[in-house]
């Protein structure tokens, strides 16, 4: 049998959920059950936390557990931030699957997302992070300032587009 958990110890649990939906308690139970938390209640807390800004988007949620209390923090992926920047109307996730987003976002939005993602990026400079986000735009299927994101990546590579560090 595993050792008993110290209740004052801080434990981080990461869960991938769809915003605004109460996830299956059965998927949460193995992760947070041993920490002495009720999976159903945590599922409702996650749904409440993600309902406003992240409704219908797949996001990672960080649960910080201490003294049998869970604090919910949303850790959005680059794709979730790009889709949110597109400001598309919500869709019923049950009916519409594998959507190609064909909107357009500004280059300023891309740099803003890059600044948010900077701490989690592998790139040395902000320009590298911007190129990572442009790659995500390619995957999502949107354009940036009416251009193909691959073209903008090439312009950054060639030094035609400058990205200020601050």
From Swiss-Prot:
CDD domains: Ribosomal_L11 (cd00349). It comes from the Eukaryota. GO terms for biological process: translation. PROSITE patterns: RIBOSOMAL_L11. SMART domains: RL11. Signal peptide: none annotated. GO terms for cellular component: chloroplast; cytosolic large ribosomal subunit; cytosolic ribosome; endoplasmic reticulum; nucleolus; nucleus; plant-type vacuole; plasmodesma. GO terms for molecular function: mRNA binding; rRNA binding; structural constituent of ribosome; zinc ion binding. Keywords: Ribonucleoprotein, Ribosomal protein, RNA-binding, rRNA-binding. Binds directly to 26S ribosomal RNA. Belongs to the universal ribosomal protein uL11 family. This is Large ribosomal subunit protein uL11z. The gene is RPL12A.
């Amino acid at each position: 049998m595993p050792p008993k958990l110290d209740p004052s110890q801080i434990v981080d649990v990461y869960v991938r959920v769809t915003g605004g939906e109460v996830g299956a308690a059965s998927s949460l139970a193995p992760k947070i059950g041993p920490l002495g938390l009720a999976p159903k209640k945590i599922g409702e807390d996650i749904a409440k936390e993600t309902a406003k800004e992240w409704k219908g988007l797949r996001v990672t949620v960080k649960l910080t557990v201490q003294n049998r209390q869970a604090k919910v923090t949303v850790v959005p992926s680059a794709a979730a931030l790009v889709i949110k920047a597109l400001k598309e109307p919500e869709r019923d996730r049950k009916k519409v699957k594998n959507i190609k987003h064909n909107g357009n976002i500004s280059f300023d939005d891309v740099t803003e997302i890059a600044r948010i993602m900077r701490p989690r990026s592998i790139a040395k400079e902000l320009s590298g992070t911007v190129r990572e986000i442009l790659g995500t735009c390619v995957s999502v299927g949107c354009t940036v300032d009416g251009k193909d994101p691959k073209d903008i990546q090439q312009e950054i590579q060639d030094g035609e587009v400058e990205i200020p560090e601050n």
